[in-house]
């Protein structure tokens, strides 16, 4: 039975991945989060499965808790790195922290068990960081979108660069979707050359699971996207709000303290899902 580790299980993408995996059945899910109660409250599928440890195990703690992360990753066939925040927090480093925590944990586990099977890593990023995925987006619009999420994109770029530097012993894939929205699953396709907005979190999750299940190496250290295969996904109107506030936090980062969704972190740490 395959085992999947989800880092950031209380976030929008993390919850969707947990739901997709549990709905599919015949697998074990290790869900890492800062708050077990939040996960069970926001993800009914997790609440239903939590009593059956053969299906779901929840690991609550901090990313720098080596024991928690090691236990979460031990025996995993794939690891989803979807630790994230939703707005343009200055100084955000949650993606970098997660990448370093996973790599350090796998090194510890490999030292303890030489020759162990290493999981495939699937990291959530953004189509805005892959120019070839945004060929149909006007340059001015692309600039606005990148600027409105500048702090988060700097974090994602750092995490991706770090994971790519591990390509001599780890396999990672960087999933870069377009604009995301809470909606039903409409069907998905993993795509190598373009992104599409809007895309539901459930369709994104299904695509990320498909990438994680691939064993022939076609996605090794590649950037991919996920696109819907049917019409009807609603437009992510909340993205307009986050674009406006994101521009504010880019040009006037001090305003985040008063208008941001999260407490500002110390310089070396940011709050995670």
Q: For each predicted feature, which ranges?
A:
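Conserved Rossmann-fold NAD(P)-dependent oxidoreductase catalytic core, especially the SDR/UDP-sugar
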Residues: 90, 101-150
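Conserved beta-loop-beta element that borders a ligand/cofactor-binding pocket
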Residues: 160-183
């Amino acid at each position: 039975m395959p085992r999947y580790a989800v880092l950031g299980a209380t976030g929008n993408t993390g919850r969707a991945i947990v739901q997709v995996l549990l709905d599919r059945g015949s697998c074990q899910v290790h869900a890492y989060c800062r708050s077990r109660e939040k996960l069970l409250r926001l993800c009914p599928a997790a609440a239903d499965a939590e009593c059956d440890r053969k299906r779901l195990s929840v690991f609550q703690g901090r990313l720098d808790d080596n024991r928690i992360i090691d236990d979460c990753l031990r025996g995993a066939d794939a690891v989803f790195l979807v630790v994230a925040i939703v707005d343009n927090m200055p100084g955000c480093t949650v993606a970098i922290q997660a990448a370093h925590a996973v790599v350090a944990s796998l090194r510890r586990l490999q030292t303890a068990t030489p020759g162990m099977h290493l999981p495939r890593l699937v990291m959530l990023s953004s189509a805005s960081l892959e120019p070839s995925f945004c060929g149909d987006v006007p340059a001015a619009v692309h600039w606005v979108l990148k600027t409105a999420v500048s702090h988060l994109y700097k974090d994602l770029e750092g995490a991706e660069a770090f994971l790519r530097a591990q390509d001599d012993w780890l396999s990672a894939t960087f999933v870069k979707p377009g604009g995301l929205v809470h909606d039903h699953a409409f069907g998905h396709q993993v795509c190598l050359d373009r992104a599409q907005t809007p895309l539901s979190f459930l369709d994104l999750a299904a695509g990320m699971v498909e990438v994680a299940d691939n064993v022939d190496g076609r996605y090794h250290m590649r950037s991919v996207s996920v696109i819907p295969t049917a019409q009807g996904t609603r437009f992510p109107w909340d993205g307009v709000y986050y674009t406006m506030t994101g521009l504010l936090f880019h040009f006037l980062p001090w305003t985040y303290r008063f208008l941001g969704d999260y407490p500002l972190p110390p310089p070396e740490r940011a709050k995670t899902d």
